Amino acid sequence: MSLIEIKKVENKKDLKTFIDFHYDLYEGNEYDVPNLFSDEMNTLSKDKNAAFEFCEAEYYLAYKDGKLAGRVAAIINHKANSKWGKKSVRFGWIDFIDDREVSKALLDAVEKYGREKGMEDVVGPLGFTDMDPEGMLVWGFDQLGTMPTIYNYAYYPEHIEALEGFEVDNKYVEFKIMVPDEVPEKYAKIAMMIEKRYNLHVRKLTKKDIFQGGMGQKIFDLINDTYKDLYGYSELSQKQIDQLIKSYLGFLDFNLITCIEEWTDGEHKLIGVGITMPSLAHALRKCRRGRLLPFGWFHVLRAIKMHKTNIVDLLLIGILPEYRAKGANALLFADLIPWYQKYGIEWGETQVELETNAGVQGQWGALTPVMHKRRKCYKKIIK
């Protein structure tokens, strides 16, 4: 029998090894989209990620016969546990060679950590919050990954489902939606009608709106409100919101962000937002081992600012429930579709959606949606 050793990440050098393992394991894979090393370091560093206000975590490396063979993060989100009445330890950032002794040892380490912390079950793959990738790919292994989601080899779910005690906790789907030659008549008519009937209006943003006008704050307050009932969601803290505004919003193309406001008695109430961006999938694949230097930055800049891609990622779409029924999503897409056409975008990637979320999936109907990926989250009771 081979010797499997589990080592806890103790310092920055270990953390670098933890991050770099993914690049090594997926080198040459034509579908994996590696995250930027700097983003991974910021997310996993306990002194940098604002989620550690209410999360705690340990990271583990697995060695087989002295050679690095796997990694996993064990995460406890105390805010989510409190909100949902759970005592769960999450596993995330899980990667391993095709060896069932290795995958078992990694998940045993997560279970042991959870047991020591008084947790009652193991769930995952999940990150610290819903802003992190979640769900193990179980179908669609021949589809290009995206920056906001996990790509994994087909043997991963086989390993998890073969382990004693693990069962499926949730199922997710993702869709490819096509950019039409013209705004669908359905969207155009509804958009015109609700503008007049409900006084809903499109608002485009500037950097000044985001950083000085308070719109960045309003956007994430809205996201908290519209996502609050989703599986495992924990509301973003003020520190997280500040971090997201500073780190990400300012770098996006504001033409691809659409806000919807209700105008009443001089008040402009934000009721919906769509944050989309040119896909960085091909650009990130050109960043050697997730590094922006020496030439990775050029490919990322070309994608974001010069739109050198035909794919758009629909990162965050949030509309208050009472306005979804009024057709506010039609107003959103009636504004975004002409921008996609102008930039040469041919299709878009939705993000991870619960398989049971018919309301979200229904909004893609006029855009020829094709379900092309499936994911699962797993759960095991700690004994």
Question: What positions do the PLM features span?
Answer:
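Acyl-donor binding region in acyl/amide transferases
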Residues: K83-G165, R288-A366
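Short beta-strand segments
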Residues: V123, K176, C259, I275, ...
